Amino acid sequence: MAHKKAGGSSRNGRDSDGRRLGVKKFGGQAVVSGNIIVRQRGTKWHPGTNVGMGKDHTLFALVEGRVEFRTKANDRTYVSVVPALEAAE
């Protein structure tokens, strides 16, 4: 009777799926209130004007307008939303 001994079993072969983090709305893009701008772990980007931060550090728009990224003197990058009224002027 033909027979093949059982091969060893590998302990590798697992990997978790990516978490889909990163910038979702880029500088100059239009957003409405509640739109997610950045998903992140920790504060790589900080909330600026008209931007809120969720408990998982997600940044989201508080008003309708355009997204703006700005680096300040303390080397922190802030994400702001310039309201649609100001952007039109």
From Swiss-Prot:
Task: Look up the domain of life of the source.
Answer: Bacteria
| Disordered, as annotated region | 1-24
Q: Which InterPro entries match?
A: Ribosomal_bL27, Ribosomal_bL27_CS
| One GO-annotated biological process of the protein | translation
State the GO CC annotations. Answer: cytosolic large ribosomal subunit
One of the Pfam families matching this protein, by short name: Ribosomal_L27
Family recorded in the similarity comment: Belongs to the bacterial ribosomal protein bL27 family.
**Name of the protein in question:** Large ribosomal subunit protein bL27
Q: What is the primary gene name for this protein?
A: rpmA
